From Swiss-Prot:
Zn(2+) 1 binds at H83, H111, H119. This is Alpha-crystallin B chain. PANTHER family: ALPHA-CRYSTALLIN B CHAIN (PTHR45640:SF5), HEAT SHOCK PROTEIN HSP-12.2-RELATED (PTHR45640). GO terms for molecular function: amyloid-beta binding; metal ion binding; protein homodimerization activity; protein-containing complex binding; structural constituent of eye lens; unfolded protein binding. It comes from Mesocricetus auratus (Golden hamster). It comes from the Eukaryota.
Length: 175
């Protein structure tokens, strides 16, 4: 019995599953584009190379922003939570971690019914006191979690170097 073995780098243009990894090219949690599900006429060509997924604009540019910053005087986290009301959000500190949780029950939007839930955890830097963490929600739906960084204890000073006449390392006694 003869079995045809195809080289994995050679794609047959009319084989419908010539690119099964296309769905795995996306970033986890990113939305699917129509081109991810259906082949275009150009993608059926054996010479077509799909552009890398990093060239696609991530969806958090318009929704789902999550950004952590370490500035000179403070630690801050900005999180887009515009789909949640303040009552549907919870921010808590557990040891050296800030945990943000949001959940809303099913409700109608322009596409149908939707329910959402998320959990985010951010490690608090060592120079931020967990008791000083605060949070606020802006009018455009961005949750900000802040904490001031501890300042160095005292001003910088130069320590003079003194010279000693005796050696720091002496010879070990011989046996």
């Amino acid at each position: 019995m003869d079995i045809a073995i195809h080289h994995p780098w050679i794609r047959r243009p009319f084989f419908p599953f010539h690119s099964p990894s296309r769905l795995f090219d996306q970033f986890f949690g990113e939305h699917l584009l129509e081109s991810d599900l259906f082949s275009t006429a150009t993608s059926l060509s054996p010479f077509y190379l799909r552009p890398p997924s990093f060239l696609r604009a991530p969806s958090w540019i318009d929704t789902g922003l999550s950004e952590m910053r370490m500035e000179k005087d403070r630690f801050s986290v900005n999180l887009d939570v515009k789909h949640f009301s303040p009552e549907e959000l919870k921010v808590k500190v557990l040891g050296d971690v800030v945990e943000v949780h949001g959940k809303h029950e099913e409700r109608q939007d322009e596409h149908g019914f939707i329910s959402r839930e998320f959990h985010r955890k951010y490690r608090i830097p060592a120079d931020v006191d967990p008791l000083t963490i605060t949070s606020s929600l802006s009018s455009d739906g961005v949750l900000t979690v802040n904490g001031p960084r501890k300042q160095a204890s005292g001003p910088e000073r130069t320590i003079p170097i003194t010279r000693e006449e005796k050696p720091a390392v002496t010879a070990a006694p011989k046996k």
